[in-house]
Amino acid sequence: METVRSAPPGDGAAEALLKELERQVQDVVRASSWWERHGVDCAILALSLLALPAGFLCLRAHNILAFATGITILGVCHYTLTVKGSHLATHSALTESKRWSKILMIFFLEVCTAFSAEFAKFNHVNLHHVYTNVVGLGDSSTWKVPLLNRYVYMFLGPLLVPIITPLVALEHLRKEEPRTALRTLGFICLGLYSQYWLFMNVSGFKNPSSALACMLLTRSLLAHPYLHVNIFQHIGLPMFSPDKKPRRIHMMTLGVLNLPRQLVLDWAFGHSLISCHVEHHLFPWLSDHMCLKVKPLVSKFLHEKQLPYNEDSYLARFQLFLSRYEEFMVHVPPITELVGVQ
């Protein structure tokens, strides 16, 4: 068991700190326009949808540069819709309407991502966010595959994500109500077949195997950073016992890490998954743009209150995981106990 010796504030002080930070963030949100709160991210998602025809048409050209451009457009747009769009929709961060939030969640998760909306929301919002880095609940253990060695997992494993995603969804459908399962299955099939149809009829592929290969290629374009980001920002940080989990502000500041800004990943994954992950875990209802806007405030507040604000580079985390792969991804993590908090 690991012990944090410099004890953070106790329960009462922790609640007061969180309320003070929430008040400051709410003041920023109230002073922000609709464009800042939702419009910027909605515009990015809309542009990604509008760019899809150009990507499919580029693949018609018998030119390697045009083909590469088409694959890049389709790949980046795919991840923008399936990662950024799905993530924001799951947190109802794209609109304040409950009805539209539900519609957008189904569209981005089931049609675009080929995954179950209900299953994703339960695992991400109800488990991962509520029990961040709590062993057996929100500890990101679903990303661990102990059977794979470090090189296979870090370099080849990501290529399996587009194949595994719909298979996991189909496996889960057996536990859903028949009506929900049929809806999810229908939308997953619609999304996959629509992309296949577009490759065959708009891009002009002559045989199904070529279309399927391009589907896999575009869905794998950013699979490596997608997998890496999901493990870098939680695994290797303090883990907590379910019966001794710390107060929320300690859980989120100790167990979450920000990566530096990176143009492509910021666009495709969103600020809340890259450079503002701490802010996102503290305020999951904020859009990507709002997470970026409150980042200086949150960083300053946590530093002033002598609370952790974890930051590291992508390369540093990559090297760390390669060198300590068994410790992080195979063995049971040590439990961190905060002295003076529980």
Curated annotation (Swiss-Prot):
A motif (Histidine box-1) lies at residues 87-91. GO terms for cellular component: membrane. InterPro entries: FA_desaturase_dom, Fatty_acid_desaturase. Its EC number is 1.14.19.-. Belongs to the fatty acid desaturase type 1 family. One of its GO terms (biological process) is fatty acid biosynthetic process. This is Fatty acid desaturase 6. Pfam families: FA_desaturase. The keyword Transmembrane helix applies. It comes from Mus musculus (Mouse). Pathway: Lipid metabolism; fatty acid metabolism. It is a multi-pass membrane protein. Its main location: membrane.
